[in-house]
Amino acid sequence: GGITCIMGESGAGKTTLLRLLMGLEKADSGIITGFDKVSAVFQENRLIEHLNAVENTALVIKDRNAGKCAYEQLLQLLPKEALLKPVREYSGGMKRRVALVRAMAADSEIVLLDEPFTGLDSRNSKKAAEYILSEQRGRTVISVTHDMEMCKMLGAGICLLTSGKAVATIL
């Protein structure tokens, strides 16, 4: 039910760890359990480009008012006038925010974030961090990042990864 940031140099295995937790890759040894209801922000965002932000987000909301719920969530990070445009017209930072809202809006127990602040300026990074905190709702959030300031803002524990191994943990 907490927030942990995974940090390390490029190639340390951070994204591979997230892919293992999502079941997208198979571990060489050992067993990973307890990752059934997972939502994620991938480095590539993985949005449906011809849909708008509301439609992309509503896909993961299990509520008959999914569109309204998605709209309200998105307003926290995006300008109102952008919400109904196809995401293919968005900047990289706007797409990133839609992907973040979609992951946090899903009915998941665990949220995995792969570089969630990439493409965001400092103001929008701060808003995104505040959004993560407001929408955590007791879920486990694991974020891969290079940004120590964001880890501090999230009040996150930190796990330092080197060559695929956790070499330090700061809680």
Where are these regions (language model features)?
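Helix-to-loop junction immediately C-terminal to a conserved catalytic motif
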Residues: M22
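Helix N-cap at the start of a conserved alpha-helix in ABC-type nucleotide-binding domains
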Residues: S122-N124
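Conserved ABC ATPase signature
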Residues: P86-Y90
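Q-loop/switch helix immediately C-terminal to the Walker
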Residues: L51-D63
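Conserved H-loop
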Residues: R139-V144
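Conserved ABC ATPase "signature" region
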Residues: G67-L83
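Catalytic Walker B motif of ABC-type/P-loop ATPase nucleotide-binding domains
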Residues: V111-E115
